[in-house]
C-alpha cells in the first residue's frame, strides 16, 4: 500500500496539493508516481473535500477523509489505516504529498528495505554532495550503524569531522560519510498505530524531527541508499515554479 497524507493548509504554499504542475494538480502527480511504482492500492488521506475531488475518478486511487486536528502526517495515516481496515502486517509506504517527481524505484526500494530488514520502520538516504546541504539545517542528515540501521537523524552536519571542519566548511570532506535523509517511510500498519500513539520524545522536540521518536523509544529504522535520485519536495512558491519549469522542459 502507498498512503499519501495531504492537507490543504500550508504556511509557505497555501493550497499546495491543488497547485497545478502542467495541467494536473500536484496531488494527482504524486498519486500517479505511487501507481507507477506498482502499489496494489494508493490512498490519499486528507481532511479537505477539494483534495478528494481533485483525484476523484483516478483509477487505483482511494480517499480517506480524516480529521482536521491531526498534528502530523503520521497521525493522519494512522487514521487512514483504521478507515481502510488494513491488517497489522500490511506494508504501508508513506509518500509525502509534495513529492510529484518521486521515482518509482525509490518507492519500491523503501518497501523492500522494510521487508528484508525485519526493522519496525524503513527509510532512504542519499549522499550529501554539497557543503551548502551539509550545513543547511533544512537538509536532515543521518548516520547508520554497520547493519544499515539509523543511529541518529539531525539538522546538524553529522558526523562532525573535527579536523576538516576546523580547517574549512566550503566543501564536503572526502570519504562519503555524509548522508541526507529522504523523507519517505515504510512500516507495518500495526507499528504505524504504535508510532502515532507514542508521546513525542525529548530528541524529537529538540530537533523537530518526528522519526527520532522511534529511535528514542528503542525501535529500529532501516536505511538504504536510494537507487535513483530523489528530486526535492515542493515547499515554497519558488519550488513550485522550478517544478513547473522542469515539467515544461521534459
Swiss-Prot record:
Molecular function per GO: 3-deoxy-manno-octulosonate cytidylyltransferase activity
Family matches, as InterPro entries: Cytidylyl_trans, KdsB, Nucleotide-diphossugar_trans
Keywords, sorted A to Z: Cytoplasm, Lipopolysaccharide biosynthesis, Nucleotidyltransferase, Transferase
Name of the protein this chain belongs to: 3-deoxy-manno-octulosonate cytidylyltransferase
Enzyme class: transferase
Transmembrane segments: none
Pathway entry: Nucleotide-sugar biosynthesis; CMP-3-deoxy-D-manno-octulosonate biosynthesis; CMP-3-deoxy-D-manno-octulosonate from 3-deoxy-D-manno-octulosonate and CTP: step 1/1; Bacterial outer membrane biogenesis; lipopolysaccharide biosynthesis
Gene: kdsB
Enzyme Commission number, as recorded: 2.7.7.38
Catalytic activity: 3-deoxy-alpha-D-manno-oct-2-ulosonate + CTP = CMP-3-deoxy-beta-D-manno-octulosonate + diphosphate
Localization: Cytoplasm
Species in which this protein is naturally found: Xanthomonas campestris pv. campestris (strain ATCC 33913 / DSM 3586 / NCPPB 528 / LMG 568 / P 25)
Keyword Calcium: no
Function: Activates KDO (a required 8-carbon sugar) for incorporation into bacterial lipopolysaccharide in Gram-negative bacteria.
GO cellular component terms given for this protein: cytosol
Gene3D superfamilies xrefs: Spore Coat Polysaccharide Biosynthesis Protein SpsA, Chain A (3.90.550.10)
GO biological process: CMP-keto-3-deoxy-D-manno-octulosonic acid biosynthetic process; lipopolysaccharide biosynthetic process
Family: Belongs to the KdsB family.
Amino acid at each position: 500500500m502507498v498512503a499519501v497524507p495531504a492537507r490543504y493548509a500550508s504556511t509557505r504554499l497555501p493550497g499546495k496539493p491543488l497547485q497545478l504542475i502542467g495541467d494536473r494538480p500536484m496531488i494527482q502527480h504524486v498519486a500517479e508516481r505511487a501507481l507507477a511504482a506498482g502499489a496494489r492500492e494508493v490512498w490519499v488521506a486528507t481532511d479537505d473535500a477539494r483534495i478528494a475531488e481533485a483525484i476523484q475518478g483516478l483509477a487505483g486511487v482511494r480517499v480517506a477523509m480524516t480529521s482536521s486536528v491531526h498534528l502530523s502526517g503520521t497521525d493522519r495515516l494512522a487514521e487512514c489505516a483504521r478507515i481502510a481496515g488494513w491488517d497489522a502486517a500490511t506494508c504501508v509506504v508513506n509518500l509525502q504529498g509534495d513529492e510529484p517527481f518521486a521515482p518509482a524505484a525509490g518507492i519500491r526500494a523503501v518497501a523492500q528495505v522494510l521487508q528484508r530488514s525485519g526493522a519496525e520502520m524503513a527509510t532512504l538516504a542519499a549522499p550529501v554532495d554539497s557543503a551548502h546541504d551539509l550545513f543547511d539545517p533544512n537538509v536532515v542528515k543521518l548516520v547508520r550503524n554497520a547493519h544499515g540501521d539509523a543511529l541518529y537523524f539531525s539538522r546538524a552536519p553529522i558526523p562532525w569531522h573535527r579536523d576538516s571542519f576546523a580547517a574549512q566548511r566550503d566543501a564536503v570532506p572526502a570519504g562519503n560519510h555524509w548522508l541526507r535523509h529522504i523523507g519517505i517511510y515504510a512500516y507495518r500498519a500495526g507499528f504505524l498505530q504504535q508510532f502515532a500513539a507514542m508521546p513525542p520524545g525529548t530528541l524529537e522536540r529538540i530537533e523537530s524531527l518526528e522519526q527520532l521518536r522511534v529511535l528514542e523509544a528503542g525501535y529500529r529504522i532501516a536505511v538504504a541508499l536510494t537507487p535513483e535520485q530523489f528530486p526535492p519536495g515542493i515547499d515554497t512558491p519558488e519550488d513550485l515554479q522550478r517544478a513547473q519549469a522542469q515539467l515544461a522542459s521534459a
